[in-house]
Amino acid sequence: MANVIKLRKGLDINLTGKASKDVAIPVVQAAEYALVPAAFEGVTPKVVVREGDHVNAGDALFVNKACPEVKFASPVSGQVTAIERGERRKVLCIKVKADAEQTSTDFGKKNVDALDGAAVKQALLEAGLFGYINQLPYAVSTTPDTTPKAIFVSALRDMPLAADFEVELEGNEQAFQTGLTALSKIAKTYLGVGVDQHSNALGEAKNVELNVFDGPCPAGNVGVQVNHIDPVNKGEVVWTVDPASVIFFGRLFLTGKVDLHKKVAIAGSEMKKAGYANVLVGTPLAAFVEAQLKTTSHVRLINGNPLTGVKTTMADYVGAHTSEITAIPEGDDCDEMLGWILPRTNQFSTSRSYLSWLFGKNKEYNLDARIKGGERHMIMSGEYDQVLPMDIFGEYLIKAIIAGDIDKQEQLGIYEISPEDFAVAEFVDSSKLELQKIVRQGLNILRKENA
């Protein structure tokens, strides 16, 4: 019997253009693919290939400089065409020109039921997939020398315009279960699902403890689920795994090969059709997004969802943890008479400033990317706590991070948060602070202090 956890705090933001599972987005065959190290938070990449080298799918393109046994696999076989670098020689991406006929390194099929935790770790390390596992504290890609007290997988994606994992799960049920079984060999594994998710592969998942979350966004955040099930204290570590990565792990054990195909949602009001595209990690966005845009001007293209995603361009690629590509109006061409004072029904407000609240919570809004105000002092108390379903004082924690008071941060629970946990709080924040950026900087400083 699943444990049902009801959450009252949070905020559902219904945006126009949610992806339909019945719409298949065509994908143009790309000549080049690229692996982007920035998708793996906390990893300093050390490139282990040279331009002109030939790699198979599954061969390492770079390793974690701090932990060289953690490799990162090429999504395709082909010739390494470029190692792009930015300021201070930061590695931006490694490009691979795909072969006409793809070849994969064979790591050998494995029966996960017969493996122990050490063997599972070793298999993931050899195949270049271990880096897809994140950890709390610090919300970074983990390393094999950490010993997790538990592993958390959240199959609930409830951010605005987020992809429905049940669409991606269809046809991958066996791989998903195999991945869960493999993780359960390392530590006790918790699977979090939503009250409206009815897939048998989720409801009848084996070798995991199933928890059903009933509440508004961000109930699907794995950090929120950790906070309600097994909070992280100083000195403790939990691993968190994206559900798409669980499928990658399962495929590895079932086939012996690295297969990084995933279904990515194409969503937002600026898309002609909102649906799902079957792509590889590293696929250029131009191969499947460009043809779907209504226009290329006054549009905010986002690698991810509007709350936690990153502003991007057609020159970017599908990231390791990307589950949706969204497009919303930029808002730089708007000219509104009387501004926010004008009564209206098409604007979203958490404080009932507009008449739109009369239409109920299910009304969809076509919001743009404007902040509508400048950064200012933190005067409104309690705003964060209304939408943060965690047993922490969010406002005081943010102030402690800004002040650089590490002792106070530890007392207020910084070890169990991720930047995405403050995404909804950032949306409602009348002070217009970049809360996710503040949290990330605080976690990075704390990680360096504790190294």
Task: Identify the residue ranges that each predicted region occupies.
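Conserved "cap/hinge" positions at secondary-structure junctions
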Residues: 59, 64-66, 84
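Short coil-to-beta-strand transition motifs
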Residues: 69-77
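Short, solvent-exposed loop/turn positions at domain surfaces
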Residues: 43, 49, 66-69, 273
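Generic structural signal for buried aliphatic residues
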Residues: 55, 61-62, 285
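N-terminal, Lys/Arg-enriched amphipathic/low-complexity engagement segments
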Residues: 1-48, 63, 213
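Short histidine-centered loop motifs in beta-beta connectors
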Residues: 44-54, 58
